[in-house]
Amino acid sequence: GQEKWRTQMGDINIGESMTMAPLVVKDRVLVGVSGGEFGVRGFVTANDVNTGKQVWRMYSTGPEEEVGFPGSVETWKGDEWKRGGGTTWGWYSYDPELDLFYYGTGNPGSWNPDQRPGDNKYSMTIFARNPDTGKAVWAYQKTPHDAWDYDGINENVLVDLNINGAMRKVLVNFDRNGFSYVLDRKTGELLQANPFVFVNWAKGVDLKTGRPIEDPEKRTSATKNTKDICPSAMGGKNQQPVSYSPRTGYFYVPTNNLCMDYEGVEVKYQQGQPYVGAIVVSKPGPGGNRGEFIAWDPTTGKKVWGIKEGLSAWGGALATAGDVVFYGTMEGWLKAVNAKTGDVLWKFKTPSGIIGNPMTYKGPDGKQYVAVLSGIGGWSGIGVAADMSLEDPTAGLGAIGAFKDLANFSNQGGVLTVFALP
């Protein structure tokens, strides 16, 4: 139980922090960096698992030798790439057969797109890297020149799927920009891109170029307040993870039905200070419900069934071999549903909103247990968890506009609730 080594991963004085779990691959400890709203330049670091010493570090933006992949610097104005965001605070996946690990990079800085013309590579990108060297084998940018804060760090799920009659080793990503992506995880070839929530900032994705087909009326700027952009910066899906069932072949996805008004503002970079540069108001999307829990068929790119929720589905999903799927709601309900039909089989009200992930395990007594941690907070719960005005819809980077009434449904307080199966 004694500490074996300790190493500093970043500099808090310039806004760098660490909010992710590391991934150990062979003798490497892979760790990213947070701080995209502070002008932090994203990077991923490999440390020696035995000594803690840095083996390599690769950045999201900048010269090829620092990114491990060509084509970044020329997509930025001047030296904006030095504070270009692309932080790496999400989830990492590893394929031992291909010996590649995968992760997403976040939004560029600042949120005002007028200050950083160009594609802003490699923010908003899925990287495939070699864990020994850090060199990137491929990179796919989902949202070039992000003008909506569609922070691209969501998890990448590695599965083998039948795509167009052939089995492919793929990576599946449900991005905050509202599109579900299926890529060949060996080559980075884009195989599918389909909206899994209501999307109007783009009309689709060109599979040949990989670029979104944008609606120019929904592009944001510091010269106007762009109205009713869907999804909002809070994402078609935020950081709550999906679950995949090889029994049904479906992904189970907790989603948001939120849109926003967005206006960029001029902001100057100051080391260690917020570097946002936008006024945002999130609000309920079409139909008024703010969330939906869906089953998604990745081979067809279509929703199979959905359960609409009054508030966003901000907790993760758990699919089991018994064809039962669990998920939580911001009101505090833990629900069990039929994986094939979406019928609600059972639900239990926990003391606070659920933004964590249900889990299951086998105890020493041989019984199977299901557990969930409730306790509202985070971005969606900031109106309850923090002291801020509920009369200002721009507060909490726009979260108050979407969840002003959250206190009517959920209180603070963290509780771990555990259920034993018969």
Regions found by a protein language model. Name each.
Residues 31-42, 103-120, 257-286, 375-408:
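Short, conserved, GDST-rich strand-edge loop motifs in beta-rich repeat architectures
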Residues 2-9, 53-62, 67-82, 135-141, ...:
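Aromatic (tryptophan-biased) beta-strands that constitute blades/sheets of beta-rich domains
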Residues 235-263, 273-348, 352-361:
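C-terminal substrate/ligand-recognition segments
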Residues 48-51, 113, 131-133, 185-187, ...:
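Short loop/turn segments that connect beta-strands within beta-propeller blades
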Residues 177, 320-413, 417-422:
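C-terminal structured "cap/appendage" subdomains that terminate the fold
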Residues 1-45, 49-50, 54-80, 88-89:
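Asp-box/WD-like beta-propeller blade repeats and closely related beta-sheet repeat scaffolds
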Residues 17-38, 80-111, 115, 125, ...:
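Repeat-blade elements of multi-bladed beta-propeller folds
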